[in-house]
């Protein structure tokens, strides 16, 4: 009788598995491994994912975008922890979401701390609302500016803030908070300084690149005055680290100089009129006032420039031509101001900027 004896290897091949893997059930290649899907998770799981989705689709243009995003992620992580603990009993899911929750809570707390209302001293609130707030300086940045390297000082009526040819211009920059100051040159009255105005802005601008200069005018308190005073050197270093605030100061000082020059043209201006002087003057008027200021600051020892100015101009729009005999002082650099526009305060300077140059 003829018969063929089958080998164990052939039998193993016929049934589709090897002897070592005899316990594994073969899976056809045309079927998925997920034959039985699990049931839908609890509602808490889906609500958590809804909060995640809301946080991710929040537009970045919202003012509180980051706070809302962190808030949504915090709620989502909390619901995930509840779901993993009560309905899934998954320790690893609970631990990971606890870590994520802690990170989001810390970041959310930091964002809320930054958004806290900053309290500005009552005495400084006036200059903030008048000068800095319209230029969108944040309250916290203003508080940093006024909380360091500056102090509030007092002058009684008749006391001098600066004396011509005696007081150095390198020490400080000040804004008048209360009272009124009178500016004179060799006994001749020039103009008044009112609250929320810089006291020594022309000297600050004209001597930025020079050291050891002296005031060319005398500034005396006409009332009991209080003023905010910065150390000039430390203020300069601070503004170098804050480019935005540097541009703000550059604009404010330039505009303050313009107002002072306008006061030179019309000494009868009072505080209320100065407050209304927010519109830009014509080019002709600004050039006229800059020439007049240079005639005072950069005059020689003779008083020709002062007397010529005191004789005045018939119109604020008439251009003042300095005397050909006038010489620039070696001590004070003439003020050269470009014509600025409120809408282009923070625009880069163009090569076509108008400047006033002293005639030889």
Swiss-Prot record:
Cell adhesion molecule involved in the establishment and/or maintenance of cell integrity. Involved in the formation and regulation of the tight junction (TJ) paracellular permeability barrier in epithelial cells. Plays a role in VAMP3-mediated vesicular transport and recycling of different receptor molecules through its interaction with VAMP3. Plays a role in the regulation of cell shape and movement by modulating the Rho-family GTPase activity through its interaction with ARHGEF25/GEFT. Induces primordial adhesive contact and aggregation of epithelial cells in a Ca(2+)-independent manner. Belongs to the popeye family. Residues 136-186 are annotated as: Required for interaction with KCNK2. GO terms for cellular component: bicellular tight junction; caveola; lateral plasma membrane; membrane; plasma membrane; sarcolemma. Residues 70, 114-360 are cytoplasmic. Keywords: cAMP, cAMP-binding, Cell adhesion, Cell junction, Cell membrane, Developmental protein, Glycoprotein, Membrane, Nucleotide-binding, Phosphoprotein, Tight junction, Transmembrane, Transmembrane helix. InterPro entries: cNMP-bd_dom_sf, POPDC1-3, POPDC1-3_dom. This is Popeye domain-containing protein 1. Residues 337-347 have a biased composition (Acidic residues). Glycans are attached at residues 2, 30. The chain crosses the membrane at residues 49-69, 71-91, 93-113. One of its GO terms (biological process) is substrate adhesion-dependent cell spreading. Pfam families: POPDC1-3. The modification Phosphoserine is found at residues 295, 318. Residues 1-48, 92 are extracellular. It is a multi-pass membrane protein. Residues 93-115 are annotated as: Required for interaction with CAV3. The keyword Lyase does not apply. The gene is POPDC1. It is found in: Lateral cell membrane; Cell junction, Tight junction; Membrane; Cell membrane, Sarcolemma. Residues 325-360 are annotated as: Disordered. Homodimer. Homodimerization requires the C-terminus cytoplasmic region. Interacts (via the C-terminus cytoplasmic tail) with TJP1. Interacts (via the C-terminus cytoplasmic tail) with ARHGEF25/GEFT (via the DH domain). Interacts (via the C-terminus cytoplasmic tail) with VAMP3. Interacts with KCNK2; the interaction enhances KCNK2 surface expression. Interacts with CAV3. Residues 350-360 have a biased composition (Polar residues). It comes from the Eukaryota. GO terms for molecular function: cAMP binding; structural molecule activity. It comes from Sus scrofa. The keyword Cell membrane applies.
């Amino acid at each position: 009788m003829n018969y063929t004896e089958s080998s164990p290897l052939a039998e193993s091949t016929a049934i589709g598995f090897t002897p070592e893997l005899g316990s594994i059930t073969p899976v056809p290649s045309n079927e998925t491994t997920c034959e039985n899907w699990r049931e839908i998770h609890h509602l808490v799981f889906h609500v958590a994912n809804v909060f995640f989705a809301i946080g991710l689709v929040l537009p970045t243009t919202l003012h509180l975008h980051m706070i809302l995003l962190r808030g949504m992620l915090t709620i989502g992580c909390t619901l995930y922890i509840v779901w993993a603990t009560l309905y899934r009993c998954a320790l690893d899911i609970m631990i990971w979401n606890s870590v994520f929750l802690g990170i989001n809570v810390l970041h959310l707390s930091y964002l809320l701390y930054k958004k806290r209302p900053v309290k500005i001293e009552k005495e400084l609130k006036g200059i903030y609302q008048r000068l800095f707030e319209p230029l969108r300086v944040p309250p916290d940045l203003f508080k940093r500016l006024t909380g360091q390297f500056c102090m509030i000082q007092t002058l009684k009526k008749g006391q001098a803030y600066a004396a011509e040819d005696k007081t150095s211009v390198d020490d400080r920059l000040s804004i008048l908070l209360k009272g009124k100051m009178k500016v004179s040159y060799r006994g001749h009255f020039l103009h008044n300084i009112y609250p929320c105005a810089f006291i020594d802005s022309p000297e600050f601008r004209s001597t930025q690149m020079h050291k050891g200069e002296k005031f060319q005018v005398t500034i005396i308190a006409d009332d009991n005055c209080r003023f905010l005073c910065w150390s000039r050197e430390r203020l300069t270093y601070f503004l170098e680290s804050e480019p935005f605030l540097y541009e703000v100061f550059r604009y404010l000082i330039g505009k303050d100089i313009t107002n002072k020059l306008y006061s030179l043209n019309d000494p009868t201006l009072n505080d209320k009129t100065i407050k209304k002087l927010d519109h830009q003057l014509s080019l002709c008027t600004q050039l006229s006032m800059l020439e007049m200021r240079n005639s005072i600051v950069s005059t020689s020892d003779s008083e020709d420039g002062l007397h010529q100015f005191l004789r005045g101009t018939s119109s604020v729009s008439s251009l003042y031509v300095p005397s050909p005999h006038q010489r620039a002082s070696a001590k004070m650099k003439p003020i050269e101001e470009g014509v600025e526009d409120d809408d282009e305060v923070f625009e880069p300077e163009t090569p076509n900027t108008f400047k006033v140059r002293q005639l030889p």
